[in-house]
């Protein structure tokens, strides 16, 4: 039995600086005897940040150093200035439902309509009262936060996108996820967990997001 902290084990662990030059920095986290107590796989996680003009690119690379297959989930949690009335505009029209989590942080077995054939999610005072919006099946690869300022956020092919803020807070977090919370029907076999990622021995997985200042 292994106990995983909320949001995973990497969030609050110290990373080593692997490279730092000019407009790019790479940080490394490697498994050790402490990580193995909550996550029984040997790994290296590389997190790179690079400034390119008006863009910030964040790339995460997971490397399997276990002598066998490895299962994992990973995501990002960048936050951007945003206020009530601002609009999250997708690249193309979307019909989306949101999933929700309950007080135990488990996915509720119900979906809630969000937008229908529309590009826009309007930030309202109560949009996050039931916690994050958990979206899947998105056709767009990017979106924009449109208000007094404008940011274009590219999230690529991630299977889940979380959108969250503390109610009334002057920001919004855009969270590309490769994995998602369990529901009440928890699978004992991690290989069957919804959204789980798998790597063969010696394999690696990479994903990135980009935030570009438009105005």
Spans of model-derived segments:
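Active-site/ligand-binding surface loops and adjacent short beta/alpha elements
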Residues: 69-71, 79-156
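Beta-strand elements of well-folded, non-transmembrane domains
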Residues: 31-33, 51-53, 64-66, 78-82, ...
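Short, structured beta-strand/loop micro-motifs enriched in basic residues and often containing a Trp
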Residues: 184-191
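Glycine-rich active-site loops that engage anionic ligands at enzyme catalytic sites
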Residues: 146-182
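Extended, loop-rich substrate-binding clefts of extracytoplasmic carbohydrate-active enzymes
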Residues: 4-53
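Asparagine-centered strand-capping/turn motif at beta-strand->loop junctions
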Residues: 60-66, 165
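Short Pro-Gly-centered flexible turn/kink motifs
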Residues: 60, 197-214
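Coil-to-beta-strand transition motifs
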Residues: 40-44, 51-57, 67-71, 169, ...
């Amino acid at each position: 039995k292994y106990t995983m902290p909320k949001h995973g084990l990497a969030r609050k662990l110290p990373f080593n600086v692997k490279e730092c030059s000019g407009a790019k920095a790479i940080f490394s986290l490697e498994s050790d005897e402490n990580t193995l107590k909550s996550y029984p796989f040997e790994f290296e996680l590389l997190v790179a940040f690079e400034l390119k003009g008006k863009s910030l690119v964040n790339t995460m690379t997971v490397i399997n150093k276990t002598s066998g297959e490895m299962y994992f989930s990973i995501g990002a949690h960048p936050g951007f200035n945003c206020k009530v009335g601002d609009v999250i505009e997708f690249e193309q029209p979307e019909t989306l439902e949101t999933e929700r989590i309950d007080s135990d942080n488990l996915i509720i077995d119900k979906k809630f309509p969000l937008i229908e054939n529309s590009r826009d999610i309007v930030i309202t005072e109560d949009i996050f009262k039931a916690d994050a919006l958990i979206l899947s099946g998105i056709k767009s690869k990017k979106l924009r936060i449109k208000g007094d300022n404008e940011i274009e956020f590219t999230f690529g092919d991630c299977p889940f996108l979380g959108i969250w803020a503390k109610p009334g807070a002057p920001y919004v977090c855009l969270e590309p996820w490769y994995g998602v919370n369990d529901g009440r029907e928890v699978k004992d076999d991690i290989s069957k967990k919804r959204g789980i990622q798998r790597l063969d021995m010696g394999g690696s997985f990479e994903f990135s997001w980009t935030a570009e200042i438009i105005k």
